[in-house]
């Protein structure tokens, strides 16, 4: 098994290398694409979560054999590196291997509480990121309706602030955007975010005016002087004809 791979398609917009550590994810986000990509039964994907067999040693072996060095490796695409309610020791061990071999990690999670336990392994060459789709006020302190078993938005942002205070690069994946107004508010007030990556909701209905939202988000990001990347599908909406919808 070669767990480290080069992402293809839309995933290439996130990084040059990636590892998917677990066989599933318990967070049950309604927009999750992973079961379809992996051709897995959706219920089994969300209920049968374990580290892929031998993945820790396979990661070490691949890095040594292929002399992978000074690369940014993304954790993860088809799972969360910190599945809430499960042991994330394999993630910690893989981060150790990546760092000891002279590489760097880019983490994306919806579980800030567990992820913060590994901040002692990260430094100024690494990136810690959370998914922030935009949420209603009554969802801020608990698992959102759209991500029923994930950490609360508050927990994620708190972890992001902690990472920032420790000198770790921070980023937010606002993809998919579910609440446009809240995402823009977060852009304006979260001064501890070093990079935003923003994309639209795909394969599900939405009444968001993507052209208007994209332009408003870009204006806010430029005003803050924050690094950002607009995903291709959202950029296409911004550059195309306006669709009848509401922000």
PLM region spans:
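Conserved AdoMet/S-adenosylmethionine-binding subsite of the radical SAM
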Residues: 54-223
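Surface-exposed, active-site-proximal loop segments in enzymatic domains
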Residues: 41, 141-144, 244-246
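C-terminal accessory extensions appended to soluble enzyme cores
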Residues: 208-247
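N-terminal [4Fe-4S]-dependent radical SAM core
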Residues: 1-72, 80
């Amino acid at each position: 098994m070669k767990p480290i791979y080069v992402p293809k398609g839309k995933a290439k917009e996130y990084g040059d290398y990636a590892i998917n550590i677990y066989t599933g994810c318990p967070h049950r986000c309604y927009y999750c694409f992973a079961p379809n990509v992996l051709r897995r039964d959706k219920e089994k994907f969300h209920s049968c979560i374990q580290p892929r067999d031998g993945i820790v040693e396979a990661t070490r072996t691949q890095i040594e054999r292929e002399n992978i060095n000074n690369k940014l490796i993304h954790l993860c695409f088809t799972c969360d590196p910190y599945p809430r309610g499960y042991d994330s020791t394999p993630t910690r061990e893989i981060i150790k291997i990546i760092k000891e071999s002279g590489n760097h990690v880019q983490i994306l999670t919806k579980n800030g509480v567990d992820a913060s336990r590994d901040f002692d392994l990260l430094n100024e060459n690494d990136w810690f990121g959370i998914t922030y789709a935009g949420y209603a006020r009554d969802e801020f302190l608990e698992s959102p309706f759209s991500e029923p078993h994930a950490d609360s938005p508050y927990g994620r942002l708190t972890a992001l602030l902690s990472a920032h205070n420790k000198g770790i690069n921070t980023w937010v994946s606002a993809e998919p955007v579910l609440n446009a107004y809240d995402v823009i508010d977060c852009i304006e007030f979260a001064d501890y975010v070093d990079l935003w990556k923003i994309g639209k909701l795909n394969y599900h209905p939405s009444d968001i005016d993507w052209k208007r939202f994209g332009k408003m988000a870009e204006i806010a990001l430029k005003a803050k002087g924050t690094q950002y990347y607009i995903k291709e599908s959202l950029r296409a909406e911004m550059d195309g004809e306006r669709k009848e919808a509401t922000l």
